[in-house]
Amino acid sequence: MLSVQNLEVVYQDVILVLRGVSFEIPKGKIVSLLGSNGSGKTTVIRSITGLLDIQNGDITKGTISVDGEDITNEKPSKIVEKGIAQVLEGRRIFAELSVLENLRLGGHTSSKDIPQNIDRVLDLFPILKDRSKGEAGYLSGGEQQMLAIGR
């Protein structure tokens, strides 16, 4: 279960962005976060995925945990290992590169782990394995989204 309790985020030590945000998401559930512009959706997601830094004072209060384990101070790469990820609206792939080249340009992974991670992605999305050498720009929209998630 993902649990966010009493999250507070302040930018530049003066701008209160979020206050008292609390919710729980049962394991295995897929959710979307809806709200008006400027309501803090992206800030909540960035907090959960480790892209806001508690050390720099961005997250000033609250706890984010997965299955009871506090991840508030964890790096994004450790949070991904817990099964927490963000799917961006834009696909953010390089159309002129192959599927494999796009996956190699992935995230915060050491170079020795890249082959293993690529294999994991291709196991998750077998359709990409069949198209791994082709240019990403020729993938369908759904396949491009799978590639973006894999990256």
Model-predicted segments: where are they?
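Conserved ABC transporter NBD signature motif
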Residues: 59-69, 116
